């Protein structure tokens, strides 16, 4: 038995005229406030959690939740915490003014759906029986040299459509149409089946034609490749007989076969090292040109400047001479290890040279400051003596 839906109609009270529907399996709590309740009624005699209505084993049940003023069902007081079955037409009274009428609504929507589906299935079965009753032989069609066979297998939908097309070709569609019209009462099904079958057969024939063209192209490619190979072999044999074969081509082929990936990698590395050498040479030449320009510039001379650190000047001159001598060496004849060792010494000396050039003006300034201070002290001492 199907559980009916519940409809609560408010006959009296603050919500008079309202009607609420609830499906089976739902739980309805009634109280004075909205929080925790599905139905809120602003009545002074209703508790915050007054009663509960729910569906239990195919029946709707009401239960009082220990309210202060109690609940009446058909003028009978309900015991708290005990459930009572509801019936169609029962009246629930709670609070000072509120009364609710209970109605059961049976939903026939599902039953209607089932009957419709059953009718559709019955019509489909009738059509299948009509199609199975027609026994046709295997029909073959030849198009572009291909054999296309239509076999009678009623298990698949496409084969049934093919049967209808075959029956049209043999002139049997009249009887089939009459049977379908007698059972269905309209020509729509026959027309739709015919159009779908024609479209399916056209698509299949086009696919077959495409397959045939692709096969032909593949065969042509294979035949042409074989012919070219044979021609190449014949030409090479003829040239060898006449003594016209190029020796250079044979040597290059042998070299390509002998060489391996490791050797090619080594060649690439050597090329990169030569590039690095060229870059280093260019940098060394630029630095040499800069040093020459710096030497050619006139230095500011001071009459009273006297450099006391003669040992440091000797070091700087020695470093410059060593740098010039080392730059004159031919870097292209060096190995990679010798180049790295040369760069280590050369870069360190170049750094020392640059720092000396930066420190030298600072030393001259400090010397002049010291001389100035000593002169001032001498002047002050003479003034004090006077």
UniProtKB/Swiss-Prot annotation:
Q: Where is the FHA domain?
A: 28-78
Q: Which residues form a coiled coil?
A: none
SUPFAM superfamilies linked to this entry: SMAD/FHA domain
**Basic and acidic residues bias: start-end ranges:** 292-303
Query: Region Disordered: which residues?
Result: 286-311
Protein name per UniProt:
FHA domain-containing protein At4g14490
Task: Read off the lineage from the record.
Answer: Eukaryota, Viridiplantae, Streptophyta, Embryophyta, Tracheophyta
